[in-house]
Regions:
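A short alpha-helical cap/connector motif
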Residues: 1-111, 115-122
Length: 122
């Protein structure tokens, strides 16, 4: 499939901030996430960098979706003013996840685009 025809790509183009995404994933995202579009879901992205992906996912999933971002950088909290929930923490720490899930509850989709070292991914 041509990634430019995907709903993910269309949402990517609408992002309010810089969004770094590899287009070769867009077909996969559409295949996996299409069933969640325009539904009341909780979506969590680990690693939000400049925040653009939050807007991309908001465009993709629709207004019913609860979009949550996790990052190490405290400056990421600035995106809360746009209706996103932002948590600052280290994805490699069990203590972070324990607190996170206690507060958040059930999550429908988790996308890990955070740390790229072995200890952060295992």
């Amino acid at each position: 499939m041509n990634y430019k025809k995907t709903n993910t790509y269309k949402s990517f183009l609408k992002s309010k901030y810089y969004c770094l995404k590899h287009t070769n994933y867009f077909d996969i995202y559409d295949d996996l996430f299409e069933k969640y579009r325009n539904k009341k879901i909780t979506f969590v992205e680990i690693g939000i960098f400049s925040g653009g992906s939050l807007f991309m996912w908001r465009n993709y999933f629709g207004k019913k979706a609860r979009i949550i971002g996790i990052d190490l950088n405290p400056e990421s909290k600035k995106f809360e003013k746009y209706g996103f929930e932002i948590f600052i923490g280290d994805q490699s720490k069990k203590s972070f996840w324990k607190k996170f899930f206690k507060k958040i509850g059930k999550v429908d989709v988790v996308l890990d685009d955070g740390g790229h070292t072995n200890y952060q991914q295992v």
